[in-house]
Design a protein with these regions (language model features):
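Hydrophobic membrane-insertion alpha-helices, especially the h-region
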Residues: 9-14
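Bacterial N-terminal signal peptides that target proteins for export
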Residues: 1-8
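Sequence signature of WD/YWTD-type beta-propeller architectures
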Residues: 15-415
Length: 415
C-alpha cells in the first residue's frame, strides 16, 4: 500500500497551537440550528440553543439516536435489560418499543420507522405505533437500512457444521419481502473459512456517499474479534469484493466521507487503543491510500470535514507491555489530507483529554474528559473560540481505551 507517512519531525514542525479561549459556545454556534441529546445522571436530556431540558428519567439511559427529521429520539434504558424506547419531541411522550430490543437498532434514513434486531430476528415499527411490528425476518446476522429506506442490506447467520462454518450471505431485502426469504436478493457470498479469511459474522453496513460501495467488518469468533477483524468493501451490485485491512471490532472506527468513495478507518490489530492504531484513508475505486499517523503516536477517533480535512483524536503511543497504565490523554489534530500538513486544535495535557470529535457543518464538537468529569466543547470548524456547551455529561464506557461516547451524546444539526 502506497502511503503518505508524516514523520515525527515534520509533525512537530507543522503543529501549531490554535488558542481555544473561554468564549461562550453559543457565539460559535451562531444561527445554526443545533440540538444535542445527552445523558446526565442516567437521565435523557436535550440542549437546544441555550436551553437544557430533561426528557426522560432513567435508570441508565443510553444510546440516544435521532430520527432523520429530528422529531424523534430512540434510546435504551436499563444497564442489563436494554429496553428500547422512542420519544416524540413535540409531546415529550415516551413509548416502550420492546423490553429486550435495545442491542441493535437503527432509524430509517427517510421515514419515522425504527428497526431493531434480537437473537437473529429483525423487526421494524412505525414510531407512532411502536408496539406493532410491520415486518419480521429471521436468521439475520447484522443489517443496515438501504440508503433509500425501502429495505435492508443484511448478512445471514453463519452456522458451525461438522466440516466448518457455513459461508455468510449478503442480502438486499426489499421491505415488502421481509420474512419471505425466497424474495431476498443475494448480493454476494463471503469466502469460506481459510488461512487468509475467517468470518462468522459481520458488523453493520455503511454505504459510500456515491452509493457504489458498502463497507463492513467481517468478524471471527468472539475471542478473536476483540483483536482483529477484516475491513471489507463490496460493490452495490456484489460483483467486486475486497478485503482492505485488519482492525479492531469497532464500527465507529470506519466512516465514509460525505462525498465520493473515500473511506477512513483506524487500522491495527490488538484491542488496546493505546498501541498500533493508525489513521488511513482510501479512495476505494482507485485504491489510492494514505496514512497520517506519525511514528510513536496512536489515533483513536476521527471526523471528516468535507474531503479536504479531518480531525483526529491522537495520543502518544504507550510502551509495549504497559497496557493502559501509562496511557496519555489524547488531543485533537486537524489534518490536511492532500498534503499531510497537521495542526493542533487542542493542546496536549496531563490533566484532561479531547475525545470523540464531531463535525457539525461550520462547527466542531468534542468531549473534554479528565478522568472524573466530562463536558462537551463547541468551537468553529478550525477548533478556534472553543467553549463549554454541555457540562456534566455521563462518562461513557471504555473497552481497552476504546471510548463509546456516542452512547451518551448525539447531535442533530439541521441544514
Amino acid at each position: 500500500m502506497k502511503s503518505l507517512k508524516i514523520g515525527l519531525a515534520m509533525l512537530l514542525f507543522a503543529l501549531v497551537w490554535m488558542a481555544g479561549g473561554t468564549e461562550d459556545a453559543e457565539a460559535v454556534k451562531g444561527d445554526n440550528e443545533l440540538i444535542a441529546a445527552f445523558v446526565r445522571n442516567g437521565d435523557l436530556w436535550i440542549k437546544r440553543n441555550n436551553q437544557e431540558k430533561k426528557l426522560a428519567g432513567g435508570p441508565f439511559i443510553r444510546n440516544p439516536r435521532w430520527s432523520f427529521d429530528g422529531k424523534w429520539l430512540a434510546y435504551t434504558k436499563g444497564e442489563f435489560e436494554k429496553e428500547l424506547w422512542v420519544l416524540e419531541l413535540s409531546t415529550a411522550r415516551s413509548s416502550l418499543v420492546h423490553p429486550e430490543g435495545g442491542s441493535r437498532f437503527q432509524w430509517s434514513p427517510s421515514e419515522e420507522k425504527l428497526a431493531y434486531q434480537m437473537n437473529g430476528q429483525l423487526q421494524y415499527v412505525d414510531a407512532r405505533s411502536p408496539n406493532k411490528p410491520l415486518g419480521t425476518a429471521d436468521g439475520i446476522g447484522n443489517y443496515s437500512w438501504l440508503p433509500s429506506g425501502d429495505g435492508f442490506f443484511a448478512s445471514s447467520q453463519s452456522e458451525l457444521l461438522p466440516d466448518g462454518w457455513t459461508p455468510i450471505i449478503l442480502y438486499r431485502i426489499p421491505i415488502k419481502a421481509l420474512g419471505d426469504i425466497s424474495q431476498y436478493i443475494t448480493v454476494h457470498v463471503l469466502p469460506k473459512q481459510s488461512d487468509d479469511f475467517f468470518a462468522v459474522g459481520t458488523s453493520v453496513f455503511k454505504w459510500s456517499a456515491d452509493g457504489r460501495w458498502i463497507a463492513f467488518l467481517a468478524t471471527p469468533t468472539a475471542s478473536l474479534s476483540a483483536d482483529s477483524n477484516t475491513l471489507c468493501v463490496v460493490s452495490a451490485d456484489g460483483v467486486v469484493f475486497r478485503t482492505l485491512d485488519e482492525m479492531v471490532n469497532n464500527a465507529q472506527w470506519f466512516e465514509w466521507a460525505d462525498r465520493g468513495d473515500h473511506l477512513a478507518y483506524i487500522a491495527g490489530v490488538g484491542r488496546e487503543a493505546t498501541r498500533n492504531k493508525q489513521l488511513r484513508v482510501l479512495a476505494v475505486t482507485t485504491e489510492k491510500a494514505a496514512e497520517y499517523t506519525p511514528k510513536d503516536f496512536v489515533d483513536q477517533a476521527f471526523a471528516w470535514q468535507g474531503l479536504a480535512h479531518m480531525v483526529v483524536s491522537r495520543a502518544v503511543e504507550s510502551k509495549e507491555g504497559s497496557g493502559l497504565s501509562e496511557a496519555a490523554y489524547p488531543y485533537l489534530v486537524r489534518v490536511e489530507l492532500e498534503n499531510g500538513r497537521q495542526k493542533l486544535i487542542t493542546k496536549p495535557s496531563k490533566k484532561h483529554g479531547a475525545y470523540n470529535p464531531i463535525a457539525l457543518h461550520s462547527m466542531l464538537a468534542w468531549v473534554k474528559y479528565n478522568g472524573a468529569e466530562a463536558d462537551v466543547m463547541l468551537a468553529d470548524e478550525n477548533g478556534r473560540h472553543a467553549g463549554e456547551w454541555i457540562k456534566r455529561l455521563d462518562i461513557a464506557d471504555s473497552y481497552y481505551g476504546q471510548w463509546n461516547w456516542p452512547a451518551v451524546l448525539s447531535f442533530y444539526c439541521s441544514k
